């Protein structure tokens, strides 16, 4: 839904998708063909890997 609603905005759609994925505990995401795809990696896993 995030990608479809903001598809006219371009970059904004990816930011909204990433924010939506972050809110679900994932480490971001991107829009692809109007569908928001979240990363499989969780934010905690990414954080632990970096620090």
Swiss-Prot record:
Q: Which GO terms describe its cellular component?
A: extracellular region
Q: Where are the Phenylalanine amide residues found in this chain?
A: 51
Q: Which residues cross the membrane?
A: none
Induction text: By bacterial infection.
Superkingdom of the organism of origin:
Eukaryota
Is-annotated flag, keyword Ligase? Answer: no
* Keywords of this entry: Amidation, Antibiotic, Antimicrobial, Defensin, Disulfide bond, Fungicide, Immunity, Innate immunity, Secreted
Q: Which GO terms describe its biological process?
A: defense response to bacterium; defense response to fungus; innate immune response; killing of cells of another organism
One Pfam family of this chain: Defensin_2
Q: Which InterPro entries has this protein been placed in?
A: Defensin_insect, Defensin_invertebrate/fungal, Scorpion_toxin-like_sf
Principal location class: secreted
Where in or outside the cell is it found?
Answer: Secreted
The cysteines joined by S-S bonds are 3-31, 17-36, 21-38
Biological role stated in the UniProt entry: Antibacterial peptide against Gram-positive and Gram-negative bacteria and fungi.
Q: Which family does it belong to?
A: Belongs to the invertebrate defensin family. Type 1 subfamily.
The protein's name: Defensin
> Where does this protein come from, organism-wise?
Bombus pascuorum (Common carder bumblebee)
Lineage of producing organism: Eukaryota, Metazoa, Ecdysozoa, Arthropoda, Hexapoda
